[in-house]
Amino acid sequence: AVDCNTVKSDLVGCVGYLPSGTGNPTPQCCDGVVKL
């Protein structure tokens, strides 16, 4: 699992993370994120 605080503090803005069930990284990737 990816920690939401780690994702939010990442300066590249969630690159390398995807919201579960989608194919598009977003700034709101904290919800149900999975590591690529």
Swiss-Prot record:
Query: Is Chloroplast one of the keywords UniProt gives this record?
Result: no
InterPro entries assigned to the protein according to its UniProt record, in alphabetical order? Bifun_inhib/LTP/seed_sf
Query: Any idea which GO molecular function terms this record carries?
Result: lipid binding
Q: Which cysteines link up through disulfide bonds?
A: none
Provide the alphabetized UniProt keywords.
Lipid-binding, Phosphoprotein, Transport
Q: How is it modified after translation?
A: Phosphorylated by Ca(2+)-dependent protein kinase.
Please report which protein family the annotation says this sequence is part of: Belongs to the plant LTP family.
What task does this protein carry out?
Plant non-specific lipid-transfer proteins transfer phospholipids as well as galactolipids across membranes. May play a role in wax or cutin deposition in the cell walls of expanding epidermal cells and certain secretory tissues.
Protein name (record): Probable non-specific lipid-transfer protein
